[in-house]
């Protein structure tokens, strides 16, 4: 990954305390940063345009600084990097302290920054400390990302990294799309099919634990070396190079150049005699030019208003006093990352 690590020791305590993380959200400082406006002016001599760019950047810096001051006042604010602020505060809930860490980032102030999810290891079924993930990917800031299965580390919910879909949504939960110049949030649905010369087969999910015995799920090499067991009365089709190479009723080795379809035998038999197989994956909404997607939930704020929909996203069971992570963005596309630790 073409990035530069900018170390900030004040984040080590928060990072190393979170073990067993399946996904992390990282800030990366891109090594492919464009020349500054000042440098370009010396080389090209197009000063009117560059002066305008410089003025625009200074204006964005002013807005960002004023916003931070207005929101956090006398709180402990540290500049991590140009356009990145770290805020520490303590608030009290039911007479007990809640330690809050907040990072705000403005892409408009520092275009050399990038935001992207990162998985714990080469495969989805793995766990790692945030500090290890951040160090590996040269991140200047990192927090734990979406939900994951504690036993294996497999992400639970939508995950796309660099336009590649790793996992599909669970219960159409809310996810954040990360673009070159901003962010969007929406509840996400999967539209996936296995397309063959004998017709198509609807896919219920990708690289996710089975929710129902009637679901048909595709497992790619990102899942790991082997697919999970088949459901009762189920079977597996092993696809390599676009062709069916094996039919199995138990776990199957996932080809590096293919995938394994796992589902009810009755459903898979409809395409078992096909000669050509292709996996077609679409995400709804079809965000144009989205680079990354990471799922979470529930909503906390929507369109500027408090909007907590735990029941609608089937998250009512996670209530109670626990450490929490939140991510969001402002109307001027500044990113907000927050952790709250108030269990003690």
Regions found by a protein language model. Give the residues of each.
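N-terminal secretory signal peptides that target proteins for export/translocation
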Residues: 1-11
């Amino acid at each position: 990954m073409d990035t530069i690590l900018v170390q900030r020791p004040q984040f080590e305590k928060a990072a190393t305390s979170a073990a067993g993380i399946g996904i992390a959200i990282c800030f990366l400082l891109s090594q492919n940063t464009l020349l500054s406006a000042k440098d370009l002016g010396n080389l090209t001599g197009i000063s009117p345009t560059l002066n305008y760019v410089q003025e625009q950047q200074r204006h964005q810096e002013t807005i960002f600084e004023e916003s931070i001051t207005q929101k956090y006042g006398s709180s402990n604010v540290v500049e991590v990097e140009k356009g990145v602020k770290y805020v520490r505060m303590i608030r009290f809930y039911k007479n007990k302290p809640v330690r809050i860490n907040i990072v705000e980032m403005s892409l408009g102030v520092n275009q050399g920054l990038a935001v992207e999810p990162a998985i714990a290891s080469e495969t989805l079924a793995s766990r790692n400390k945030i500090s290890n993930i951040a160090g590996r990917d040269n991140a200047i800031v990192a927090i734990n990302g979406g939900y994951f299965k504690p036993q294996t580390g497999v992400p639970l919910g939508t995950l796309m990294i660099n336009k590649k879909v790793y996992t599909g949504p669970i219960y159409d939960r809310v996810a954040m799309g990360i673009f070159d110049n901003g962010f969007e949030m929406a509840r996400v649905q999967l539209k996936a099919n296995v397309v063959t010369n004998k017709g198509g087969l609807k896919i219920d999910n990708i690289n996710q634990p089975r929710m129902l015995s009637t679901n048909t799920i595709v497992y790619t090499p990102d899942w790991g070396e082997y697919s999970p067991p088949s459901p009762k009365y189920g079977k597996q089709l092993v696809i390599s190079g676009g062709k069916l190479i094996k039919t199995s009723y138990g776990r199957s080795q996932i080809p590096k150049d293919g995938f394994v379809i796992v589902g009810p035998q009755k459903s898979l038999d409809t395409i078992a005699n096909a000669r050509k197989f292709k996996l077609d994956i679409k995400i709804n909404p079809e965000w144009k030019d989205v680079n990354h997607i990471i799922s979470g939930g529930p909503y906390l704020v929507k369109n500027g208003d408090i909007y907590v929909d735990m029941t609608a996203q089937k998250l009512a069971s996670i209530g109670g006093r626990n450490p929490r992570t939140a991510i969001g963005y402002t109307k001027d596309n500044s990113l907000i990352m927050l952790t709250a630790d108030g269990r003690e």
